[in-house]
């Protein structure tokens, strides 16, 4: 049973990493705009990507800064979308009216960076224990 869960978690990680590495647009979040415009936005994908942070650190695999940055971008935008009950026009508003979103995004940034910092510290700590 434990082995099946580990294999399932590893599959989630591999899928998440593959999605990120195969889609350079994720870095800038532009693919979210395309998905929203085509009404194909699927929050489950982003939930899996975010879950992969904890799974990767659980299995003592170092998380690259670039991966953390990409996951941060995804989480930031998905949280904005969830907070606004997701309207495709919100993506345009975020770009065209940054002052309107600035305070809200700052709160999200603080929470997300705390999460990322915590995960990075876990990875560093696990790495030292294994050495």
What are the functions of these language-model segments?
Residues 25-29, 62, 121:
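Intrinsically disordered or highly flexible coil/loop and linker segments, enriched in small
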Residues 73-131:
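Amphipathic alpha-helical binding modules
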Residues 51-68:
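Short, solvent-exposed, charged loop/turn and helix-capping segments
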Residues 20, 38, 53-57, 75, ...:
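Generic structural signal for hydrophobic core residues of well-folded globular domains
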Residues 1-50:
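Short terminal alpha-helical segments
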Residues 44, 66-69, 103:
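Residues within HEAT/ARM-like alpha-solenoid scaffolds
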Residues 32-39, 60, 64, 94, ...:
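Alpha-helical rod/repeat scaffolding segments in eukaryotic adaptors/tethers
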Residues 48, 69-73:
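Amphipathic alpha-helical interaction segments
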């Amino acid at each position: 049973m434990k082995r099946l869960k580990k294999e399932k978690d590893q599959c989630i990680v591999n899928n998440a990493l593959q999605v990120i590495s195969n889609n350079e647009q994720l870095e800038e979040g532009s693919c979210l705009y395309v998905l929203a415009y085509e009404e194909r936005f699927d929050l489950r994908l982003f939930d899996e990507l975010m879950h992969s942070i904890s799974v990767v650190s659980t299995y003592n695999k170092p998380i690259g800064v670039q991966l953390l940055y990409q996951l941060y971008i995804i989480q930031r935008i998905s949280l904005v979308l969830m907070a606004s009950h997701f309207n495709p026009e919100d993506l345009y508003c975020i770009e065209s009216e940054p002052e309107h979103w600035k305070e809200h995004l700052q709160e999200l940034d603080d929470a997300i960076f705390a999460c990322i910092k915590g995960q990075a510290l876990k990875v560093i700590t696990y790495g030292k224990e294994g050495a």
